[in-house]
């Protein structure tokens, strides 16, 4: 039993014990309630960052808490190991992605163990291993057979530098988010999965996600984007072709003055054949940024095609324009334009001098001036012939019915969600298991040829994927015929869409999942990860779960019961200007600062003696060189201190500001806890607690102990406000200082320290492990039981009332909790110390705060 708290000697020994005992190995137990806790698995980039530490500490706290509450806990870990960064690193370091990835996995695995995270390492998986992606390939072929997979040529964002397709979200200012290369538009064949077949269910089931943050649910609803509207068909003057549009505002239909079409629309391409100027404009549009989020702010450009659409209801001819804000891969690639009642249409019409026709006015207002600005609210129709006077819904129904009766319209439900393009033109990913035969027929790779292995011993030239460059790799046979493998690889969101399920049976080789194990553990009870994954990973995982269900592999509808989105970790960022005026960012660990009385930085100097500029607290990032190395912090302060700071400094879902003084404060608290426990134990074995024999003061301390147990249990288990739980424990420790050294004081201290150690154990498990032994407990704290608040102890039978005379304290009374004001006054007036100050005075007024204060006003 060492007197000083030295985490560097404690923590490795405790971790070794956990490893040897396989403390956190999970097995299916029917006699215990299961709890599956999962943090989003990391990409093996090489080193953990503080964002990882926060995510995984939160998950570990929840897991350990549930284990102490008698649950059978599964907390696995693995590696989201495919992806472009490995290719870039391989090129930079003159190696192949595979060895770079495997080395990083080993290094980061040791870092995770150093943090004391209670994982079942026997379930570790890496998505780049064939025994993982084999089943992903198998499942893809089954989806193909069910008609849920198809291939089509589509316009994509193409990064010519990385030779890959980019999602709209990966294009920033018309450049690649990774390498800043200008993005081009390119037509290529791609594989898609029909997520739109599940759009309605994905939307409706959001209502069942009771344990998810409202913000994430709202983001998914908006991303799926269900709308009710009308598909309308316009005849084209002089042609047999028709132009299809979709609108959610058929009430504005009589205000259509032009039709906008995408640059890639067949009518645009047809018109361009005889119009070189239009052809050049279409080419310009094809290489314009197409992120939907930027459509509202981008400059609107267009050109007339010379074609005219015929308005189905009034026969008017309206011009057809190619417009850069109309996207071919959204909807029909054409829009009806109502500049009087749509901001974008108005901006375009004003720029090009097109007609602006008002057809909606406020219910109780004047006619809108639509020449200056579009009137976008709903209202009453005018200027609309037989539909004049109708409000929105009656107008919607009447115009939709009229169009349907004429055979040129149909009510329809539309979704913003598009099918999931899973093809990637990169190497380090799972090969897509499809074959093309000599006659062009496309077939899935037969099951006995799976997995389609990705060769790992490759040379990266930075230009083309090695499997695209290697003609021999693509060659294979199918039923004796020559066949060629698909050389695209899967979007890495494929791997992360089902990994949570594979953890249930990671070594199962008879199928994608062992249904018994999967249905024992799933759904995940608690999932932890960043809110940036709300609309991609979390939606794809929900979709995949429904696919697994419909394949008979799982019997639940949703993958994750409860979701916690942790906030970012921020740190101070410092820079100085170089000779060219550029910012040179300096690590905060290399900067000494001076602060004012409010803690604000007033001066900062780096290790070179150079004064640097403080740019504020920003997200830890490589670009600003303000990441704090978790390994360095663990080596300096210990894992428990880092974990305690992470859980205490901020609510879990809010941003966390890194603070050296905060970390030091966390370590001071742990040292104090160690010292108090050591002193308590050094005085000998504590006697048994006799609740009936406790004094008023001892009862008050015990009441605070059990109130704290109740609060911490609720804060950690239900509310997940871990910072307030820690604050309550710290306050309790201050109250324990009131205890003396008599037998019942020591007995009460023993009860309190045992409770404190167990309550802190999920957050600071190493010191908890040692202090539990120090307190003389036989079993490991890993198998202890979470303390239960004693309801009787929390009942206040007595209150301490302060007695004041004319606002000055003159005495204290211990009174029954339910005493009346009259009885308190009698006791006060009978108290000698009070009488001394009231003799000869007349009581004018009595102010009573029940159970706390009695103020007698007398003169």
From Swiss-Prot:
The gene is leuS. GO terms for cellular component: cytosol. A motif ('KMSKS' region) lies at residues 619-623. A motif ('HIGH' region) lies at residues 42-52. It comes from the Bacteria. The keyword Transmembrane does not apply. It catalyses: tRNA(Leu) + L-leucine + ATP = L-leucyl-tRNA(Leu) + AMP + diphosphate. Keywords: Aminoacyl-tRNA synthetase, ATP-binding, Cytoplasm, Ligase, Nucleotide-binding, Protein biosynthesis. InterPro entries: aa-tRNA-synth_I_CS, aa-tRNA-synth_Ia, Leu-tRNA-ligase, Leu_tRNA-synth_edit, M/V/L/I-tRNA-synth_anticd-bd, Methionyl/Leucyl_tRNA_Synth, Rossmann-like_a/b/a_fold, tRNAsynth_Ia_anticodon-bd. The lineage of its organism: Bacteria, Pseudomonadati, Pseudomonadota, Gammaproteobacteria, Aeromonadales. It is found in: Cytoplasm. Signal peptide: none annotated. This is Leucine--tRNA ligase. It holds the Pfam family tRNA-synt_1. GO terms for biological process: leucyl-tRNA aminoacylation. PROSITE patterns: AA_TRNA_LIGASE_I. HAMAP family: Leu_tRNA_synth_B (MF_00049_B). It comes from Aeromonas hydrophila subsp. hydrophila (strain ATCC 7966 / DSM 30187 / BCRC 13018 / CCUG 14551 / JCM 1027 / KCTC 2358 / NCIMB 9240 / NCTC 8049). Belongs to the class-I aminoacyl-tRNA synthetase family. One of its GO terms (molecular function) is leucine-tRNA ligase activity. CDD domains: Anticodon_Ia_Leu_BEm, LeuRS_core. ATP binds at residue 622. Its EC number is 6.1.1.4. The keyword Lipoprotein does not apply.
């Amino acid at each position: 039993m060492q007197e000083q708290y030295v985490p560097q000697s404690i923590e490795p020994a405790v971790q070794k014990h956990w490893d040897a005992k396989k403390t956190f190995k999970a097995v299916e137990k029917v006699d215990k309630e299961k709890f599956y806790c999962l943090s989003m698995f990391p990409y093996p980039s090489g080193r953990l960052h503080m964002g990882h530490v926060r995510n995984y500490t939160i998950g570990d706290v929840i897991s350990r808490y549930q284990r102490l509450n008698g649950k059978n806990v599964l907390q696995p870990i693995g590696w989201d190991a495919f992806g472009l960064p490995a290719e870039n690193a391989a090129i930079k370091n003159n190696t192949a992605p595979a060895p770079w990835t495997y080395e990083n996995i080993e290094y980061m695995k040791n870092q995770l163990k150093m943090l004391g995270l209670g994982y079942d390492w026997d379930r570790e998986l890496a998505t780049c291993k064939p025994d993982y992606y084999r089943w992903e390939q198998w499942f893809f072929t089954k989806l193909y057979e069910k008609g849920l997979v198809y291939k089509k040529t589509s316009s994509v964002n193409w990064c010519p530098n990385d030779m890959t397709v980019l999602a709209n979200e990966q294009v920033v200012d018309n450049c690649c988010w990774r390498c800043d290369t200008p993005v081009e538009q390119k037509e290529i064949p791609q594989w898609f999965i029909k997520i739109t077949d599940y759009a309605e269910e994905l939307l409706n089931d959001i209502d069942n996600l009771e344990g998810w943050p409202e913000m994430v649910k709202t983001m998914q609803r908006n991303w799926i984007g269900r709308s009710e509207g009308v598909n309308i068909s316009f005849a084209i003057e002089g042609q047999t072709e028709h132009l299809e549009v979709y609108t959610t505002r058929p009430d504005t239909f009589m205000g259509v003055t032009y039709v906008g079409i995408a640059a890639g629309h067949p009518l645009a391409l047809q018109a361009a054949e005889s119009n070189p100027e239009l052809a050049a404009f279409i080419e310009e549009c094809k290489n314009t940024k197409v992120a939907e989020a930027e459509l509202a702010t981008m400059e609107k450009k267009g050109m007339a095609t010379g074609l005219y659409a015929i308005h189905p209801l009034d026969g008017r001819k309206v011009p057809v324009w190619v417009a850069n804000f109309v996207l071919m891969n959204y909807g029909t690639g054409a829009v009806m334009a109502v500049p009087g009642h749509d901001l974008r249409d108005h901006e375009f019409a004003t720029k090009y001098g097109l007609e602006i026709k008002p057809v909606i006015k406020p219910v109780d207002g004047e006619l809108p001036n639509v020449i200056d600005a579009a009137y976008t609210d709903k209202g009453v129709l005018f200027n609309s012939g037989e539909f004049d006077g109708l409000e929105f819904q009656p107008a919607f129904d009447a115009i939709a019915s009229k169009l349907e009766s004429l055979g040129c319209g149909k009510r329809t439900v539309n979704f913003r969600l598009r099918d999931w393009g899973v093809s990637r033109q990169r190497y380090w990913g799972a090969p897509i298991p499809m074959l093309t035969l000599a006659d062009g027929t496309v077939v899935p790779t037969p099951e006995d040829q799976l997995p389609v292995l990705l060769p790992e011993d490759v040379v990266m030239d930075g230009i083309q994927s090695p499997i695209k460059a290697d003609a021999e790799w693509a060659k294979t046979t199918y039923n004796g015929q020559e066949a060629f493998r698909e050389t695209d690889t899967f979007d890495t969101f494929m791997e992360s869409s089902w990994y949570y399920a594979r953890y249930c049976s990671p070594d199962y080789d008879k199928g994608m999942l062992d249904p018994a194990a999967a249905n024992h553990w799933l759904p995940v009870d608690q999932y932890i990860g960043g809110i940036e994954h709300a609309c991609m990973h979390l939606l794809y995982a929900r979709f995949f779960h429904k696919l697994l269900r419909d394949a008979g592999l799982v019997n639940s509808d949703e993958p994750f019961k409860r979701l916690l989105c942790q906030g970012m970790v921020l740190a101070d960022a410092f820079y100085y200007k170089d000779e060219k005026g550029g910012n040179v960012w300096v690590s905060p660990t290399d900067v000494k600062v001076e602060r004012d009385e409010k803690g604000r930085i007033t001066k900062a100097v780096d290790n070179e003696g150079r004064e640097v500029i403080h740019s504020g607290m920003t997200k830890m990032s490589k670009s600003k060189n303000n990441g704090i190395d978790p390994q360095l912090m663990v080596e300096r302060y210990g894992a428990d201190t880092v974990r305690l700071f992470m859980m205490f400094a901020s609510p879990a879902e809010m941003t966390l500001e890194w603070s050296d003084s905060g970390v030091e404060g966390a370590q001071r608290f742990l040292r104090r806890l160690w010292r108090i426990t050591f002193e308590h134990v050094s005085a000998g074995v504590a006697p048994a607690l006799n609740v009936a024999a406790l004094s008023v003061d001892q009862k008050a301390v015990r009441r605070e102990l059990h109130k704290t147990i109740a609060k911490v249990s609720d804060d950690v288990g239900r509310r997940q406000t871990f910072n307030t739980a820690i604050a309550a424990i710290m306050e309790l420790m201050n109250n324990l200082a009131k205890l003396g050294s008599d037998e019942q004081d020591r007995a009460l201290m023993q009860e309190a320290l045992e409770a404190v150690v167990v309550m802190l154990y999920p957050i600071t498990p190493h010191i908890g492990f040692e202090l539990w032994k120090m307190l003389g407990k036989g079993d490991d704290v890993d198998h202890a039981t979470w303390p239960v608040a004693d309801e009787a102890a929390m009942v206040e039978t007595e209150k301490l009332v302060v007695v004041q005379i004319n606002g000055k304290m003159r005495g204290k009374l211990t009174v029954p909790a339910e005493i009346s004001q009259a009885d308190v006054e009698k006791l006060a007036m009978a108290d000698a110390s009070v009488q001394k100050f009231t003799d000869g005075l007349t009581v004018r007024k009595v102010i009573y705060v029940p159970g706390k204060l009695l103020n007698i006003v007398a003169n």
